[in-house]
């Protein structure tokens, strides 16, 4: 399940491009998530009123939250699987406060892959996509284990 050094390098190479515009990438990821899986929008009280893509694109709050999401994910990815300290508070808040099901983390992972491929097609080929998928799967597996420890079966 772990990633090789080469796979981590592919993940971190593309992540460097994401960090050049975290808010923009994050906004695109959330829009893709909400459009593809409208039920996920119900978990976000401050975004429920956003019904169209144009409204989502115009929302500074959505952009800020996208930045927050991808900043946290970047911190986790940079740990190359040694992310226990970063994962614990994230799992705690997502399990007990926000009640985000693991399925929704799968949905946002799909959105991340889609956005990276659409924004960086020349830098996010099959090998990089496979490596990122593997890294996101590792993240989901580890957060699911934390959820279980917390008694959340989402």
UniProtKB/Swiss-Prot annotation:
Intracellular or extracellular location(s): Cytoplasm, Sarcoplasm
Residue numbers bearing the Phosphothreonine modification: 68
GO cellular component: extracellular exosome; sarcoplasm
CDD domains named in the record: Mb
Catalytic reactions on record: Fe(III)-heme b-[protein] + nitric oxide + H2O = Fe(II)-heme b-[protein] + nitrite + 2 H(+); H2O2 + AH2 = A + 2 H2O
Start and end residues of each Globin domain: 2-148
Membrane-traversing stretches: none
Function: Monomeric heme protein which primary function is to store oxygen and facilitate its diffusion within muscle tissues. Reversibly binds oxygen through a pentacoordinated heme iron and enables its timely and efficient release as needed during periods of heightened demand. Depending on the oxidative conditions of tissues and cells, and in addition to its ability to bind oxygen, it also has a nitrite reductase activity whereby it regulates the production of bioactive nitric oxide.
Subunit structure: Monomeric.
Protein name: Myoglobin
Gene label: MB
């Amino acid at each position: 399940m772990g990633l090789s050094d080469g796979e981590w390098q592919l993940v971190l190479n593309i992540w460097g491009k994401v960090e050049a515009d975290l808010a923009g990438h994050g906004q695109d990821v959330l829009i893709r998530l909400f459009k593809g899986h409208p039920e996920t929008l119900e978990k976000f009280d401050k975004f429920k009123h956003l019904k169209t893509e144009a409204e989502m694109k115009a929302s500074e709050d959505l952009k800020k939250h996208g930045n927050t999401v991808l900043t946290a994910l970047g911190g986790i990815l940079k740990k190359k699987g040694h992310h226990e300290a970063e994962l614990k508070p994230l799992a705690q808040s997502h399990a007990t406060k926000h009640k985000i099901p693991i399925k929704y983390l799968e949905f946002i992972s799909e959105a991340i892959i889609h956005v990276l491929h659409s924004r960086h097609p020349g830098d996010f080929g099959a090998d990089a996509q496979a490596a990122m998928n593997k890294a996101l799967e590792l993240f989901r597996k580890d957060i699911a284990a934390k959820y279980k420890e917390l008694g959340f079966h989402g």
